[in-house]
Curated annotation (Swiss-Prot):
Its cofactor is Zn(2+). Its main location: mitochondrion. The lineage of its organism: Eukaryota, Metazoa, Chordata, Craniata, Vertebrata. GO terms for biological process: peptide catabolic process; peptide metabolic process; protein catabolic process; proteolysis; regulation of gluconeogenesis; regulation of skeletal muscle fiber differentiation. Hydrolyzes oligopeptides such as neurotensin, bradykinin and dynorphin A. Acts as a regulator of cannabinoid signaling pathway by mediating degradation of hemopressin, an antagonist peptide of the cannabinoid receptor CNR1. The modification N6-acetyllysine is found at residue 664. This is Neurolysin, mitochondrial. The active site is at residue 498. Its EC number is 3.4.24.16. GO terms for molecular function: metal ion binding; metalloendopeptidase activity; oligopeptidase activity; peptidase activity; peptide binding. It comes from Rattus norvegicus (Rat). It is found in: Mitochondrion intermembrane space; Cytoplasm, Cytosol.
Length: 704
């Protein structure tokens, strides 16, 4: 997932932060004390600091706001007749870089710092800066000067990306209501500030949640010894199980005690229930009201205008059509799961209730995989120690994209477990950027998997290039005594996916910060990373990614073939669940009066055929609703149509490690960043219109 925390200017995502579609239009260079930082920025290096104290975060936030406001005031007072590209648009673009880099150091620590006070200060900084972003994005005086520039300058004399920057600035100004009356603008501004705070609080609540449950060893039946040994023990000789992914999913997939799974699923989907339900009850109507004031029927209509799908009707047709096509497959998978459950209940003496409960789904889908394909993920993970996976992943990406990675010794990082790498073009030696790897869970850390864009790759005022910097933030299991962190295959896939976002951040080479990295349409942003997931289903790639953690012996060819064949297991139910989440998201953003828990329960029954557990409220734990995917969660499935088309028509056809195809992908899909429309990039790569054939086949359906 891509996490966006500031506007269209930066990629921070998810799998967190509020993704505010605001256009920062800043003016001349900031004055001291930020000048020192600006001079480092001009050198194009990684200038990010992670040692700011809570007081420093507060002080620098106030300084950034005060000095940036002076810049806006200056731009807003330029006489209209004196407005030129150089003194308006170019100046605004130049200062964006300084603002983004400084803001990163202030608001990113909320997601990764080990210090609760630093996280709190960073969260407050994010709230203040988000309010400021809204205030400045609605400066009518600055907007008037940009409009005047478009009306008077010779657009043919400026580069295409600069024209796009100008057009997008005006488009975003109108989407912020700057063409409306002052009274309506003030209403919109006030509501946007409140929405921003609600989004930040929603995800902060999830990040800070530390709920845990206590079970006896018997209640954790069938879980492997290495998992149980990794758990914290209580004074009563029981085991503390958290709701973090490295604990939750192993229990849901392997624990043979239904009551334990029921308690875990209930707790997982009631996280932050009270506070986040209240937030959604405020946030959804606010979004609807803003959309109405701006002339849109619904919030979904508002956000989709900028996406490749364009309309709610196209999204609904896509989801409904896919749901119908998958219905027979889903029914067959449910019937098989029920047969497994009935058999196990008879063997273990459990009462058989004749239905699939929410806490049964992961457990019996895991059994399905083991029975149909003889793939035991618990045994398989012994071949995926994190050091081997990381080495193999980096090797594959380097070879495929013509890059070289070098770990930075004694790097300045926010936690001692974090590592930093420099990325260079293999042919020229040019430094393209850097990325951090933050792989393990800790208290207060962002609890999903995401790529955060920290420093934009773009041109600086002196014509040199600012290197792009990104962070891959995930939560794999911690190493324990005598055993490294071992990844399940689905975690290897997640690693590849998020690193695909990192490569998008690093390889994009744009002129403007606003178009750097993953700043593309939301329903296109997952395309590059999804496409790269295909490598973890390739036998040769899997050999590079695996080695038994004890003696280094490889996975057998037979097991590799079974693993690859298992790709289609449960694909009906897994895709139907994605459709459920997409439909819930669309519903809540087309009718803000709906009850989120009821809407989720309705679609679970109608589409998935597995009822939501009474008393839970999954949408209150659904970070995407407040993390930049509002009205746009469908984008995960929508973009997979494009990613599968690219993979099968080019990489599968020419060889998945073919360096020529890899460079074509790097140059035509990654390098443009957001400087081109997603559909234009796709057609440049495919040399035709995209189609659904490969996507449908990947779901076990007839491609025609």
């Amino acid at each position: 997932m891509i996490t966006l925390c500031l506007s269209t200017l930066r990629g921070l995502h998810r799998a967190g932060g509020s993704r505010l579609q605001l256009t920062m239009t800043l003016g001349k260079e900031l004055a001291s004390p930020l000048q020192a930082m600006s001079s480092y920025t001009a050198a194009g290096r990684n200038v990010l600091r992670w040692d700011l104290s809570p007081e420093q975060i507060k002080t620098r936030t106030e300084q950034l706001i005060a000095q940036t406001k002076q810049v806006y005031d200056t731009v807003g007072t330029i006489a209209l007749k004196e407005v030129t590209y150089e003194n308006c648009l170019q100046v605004l673009a130049d200062i964006e870089v300084t603002y983004i880099v400084e803001r990163t150091m202030l608001d990113f620590p909320q997601h990764v710092s080990s210090d609760r006070e630093v996280r709190a200060a960073s969260t407050e900084a994010d709230k203040k800066l988000s309010r400021f972003d809204i205030e400045m994005s609605m400066r009518e005086d600055v907007f008037q000067r940009i409009v005047h520039l478009q009306e008077t300058c010779d657009l043919e004399k400026i580069k295409p990306e600069a024209r796009r920057y100008l057009e997008k600035s005006i488009k975003m100004g109108k989407r912020n209501g700057l063409h409306l009356s002052e009274h309506i603008r003030n209403e919109i501004k006030s509501m946007k500030k409140r929405m921003s705070e609600l989004c930040i609080d929603f995800n902060k609540n999830l990040n800070e949640d530390d709920t845990s449950l206590v079970f006896s060893k018997a209640e954790l039946g069938a879980l492997p010894d290495d998992f149980i040994d990794s758990l914290e023990k209580t004074d009563e000789d029981k085991y503390k199980v958290t709701l973090k992914y490295p604990h939750y999913f192993p229990v849901m997939k392997k624990c043979c005690v239904p009551e334990t799974r029921r308690k875990m699923e209930m707790a997982f989907h009631t996280r932050c229930k009270q506070e986040n339900t209240a937030i959604l009850q405020q946030l959804l109507p606010l979004r609807a009201q803003v959309a109405k004031l701006l002339g849109y029927n619904t919030h979904a209509d508002f956000v989709l205008e900028l996406n490749t799908a364009k309309s709610t009707s196209r999204v609904a047709a896509f989801l409904d059509d896919l749901s119908q096509k998958l219905k027979p497959l889903g029914e067959a998978e449910r019937e098989f799961i029920l047969s497994l459950k009935k058999k196990e209940c008879e063997e273990r003496g459990f009462e058989y209730d004749g239905k699939i409960n929410a806490w049964d789904l992961h457990y019996y889908m895991t059994q399905t995989e083991e029975l149909k394909y003889s793939v035991d993920q618990e045994s398989l993970k012994e071949y995926f120690p994190i050091e081997v996976v990381t080495e193999g992943l980096l090797s594959i990406y380097q070879e495929l994209l013509g890059l070289s990675f070098e770990q930075v010794p004694d790097a300045h990082v926010w936690n001692k477990s974090v590592s930093l790498y420099t990325v260079k073009d293999k042919a020229t030696g040019e430094v393209l950027g850097q990325f951090y790897l933050d792989l393990y869970p800790r208290e207060g850390k962002y609890n999903h998997a995401a790529c955060f864009g920290l420093q934009p790759g773009c041109l600086l005022p002196d014509g040199s290039r600012m290197m792009s910097v990104a962070a891959l933030v995930v939560n794999f299991s911690q190493p324990v005594a005598g055993r490294p962190s071992l990844l399940r295959h689905d975690e290897v896939r997640t690693y590849f996916h998020e690193f695909g976002h990192v490569m998008h951040q690093i390889c994009a080479q744009t002129d403007f910060a606003r178009f750097s990295g993953t700043n593309v349409e939301t329903d296109f942003v997952e395309v590059p990373s999804q496409m790269l997931e295909n490598w973890v289903w390739d036998v040769d790639s899997l050999r590079k990614l695996s080695k038994h953690y004890k003696d280094g012996h490889p996975i057998t060819d037979e097991l590799l073939e079974k693993l690859v064949a298992s790709r289609l297991v449960n694909t009906g139910l897994l895709t139907l669940r994605q459709i459920v989440l997409s439909k819930v998201d669309q519903s809540l953003h087309t009718n803000a009066t709906l009850d989120a828990a009821s809407e989720y329960a309705k679609y679970c029954t109608e589409i998935l055929g597995v009822a939501a557990t009474p008393g839970t409220n999954m949408p209150a734990t659904f970070g995407h609703l407040a993390g930049g995917y509002d009205g746009q969660y469908y984008g995960y499935l929508w973009s997979e149509v494009f990613s599968m088309d690219m993979f099968h028509s080019c990489f599968k056809k020419e060889g998945i490690m073919n360096p020529e195809v890899g460079m074509k992908y790097r140059n035509l899909i990654l390098k443009p960043g957001g400087s081109l429309d997603g559909m234009d990039m796709l057609q440049n790569f495919l040399q035709r219109e995209p189609n659904q054939k490969a996507f449908l086949m990947s779901r076990g359906l007839n491609g025609s």
